Amino acid sequence: MAEQQYYGTGRRKTSSARVFLRPGSGDIKVNGRSLDEYFGRETARMIVRQPLELVDATEQFDVQVTVAGGGPSGQAGAIRHGITRALVQYDEALKQPLSKAGYVTRDARMVERKKIGLHKARRATQFSKR
């Protein structure tokens, strides 16, 4: 267990991901399953790979992820955030290009709460003039 590993916690909406980067061949495992098996949509898989592709590290690391909460979109965003933080821990020089791409910043957008007297967060009952 002497091999080097880098850790990053990522969050998005209600999802949180714990990401471990270890030197390897580019294998990505999410909750014990392969990336293609875990995410059905290609866009979610693409989001997860973005930070590694940006710094040309797709074949350098094996990625081990534990993700919980939220849906596929939030989980993919959380994993991306975690991978980014782990890459910054690996090499501080990568922070500048990753930050420029907008991967370092935690996406603070959350679901707006439902208000009393409305159907949804903003949807009101239809207005009748007469």
Swiss-Prot record:
GO molecular function: RNA binding; structural constituent of ribosome
Record keywords, A-Z: Ribonucleoprotein, Ribosomal protein
Gene Ontology biological process terms from the UniProt entry: translation
Pfam families referenced in this protein's UniProt entry, alphabetically: Ribosomal_S9
Keyword Ribosomal protein appears in the UniProt entry: yes
Family annotation (Gene3D superfamilies): 3.30.230.10
Keyword Nucleotidyltransferase carried by entry: no
InterPro entries for the chain: Ribosomal_Su5_D2-typ_SF, Ribosomal_uS9, Ribosomal_uS9_bac/plastid, Ribosomal_uS9_CS, Ribsml_uS5_D2-typ_fold_subgr
Gene Ontology CC annotations of this record: cytosolic small ribosomal subunit
Family: Belongs to the universal ribosomal protein uS9 family.
NCBIfam families xref list: PRK00132.1
Record PANTHER family: RIBOSOMAL PROTEIN S9, SMALL RIBOSOMAL SUBUNIT PROTEIN US9M
Protein name, entry field: Small ribosomal subunit protein uS9
Species whose genome carries this gene: Alkalilimnicola ehrlichii (strain ATCC BAA-1101 / DSM 17681 / MLHE-1)
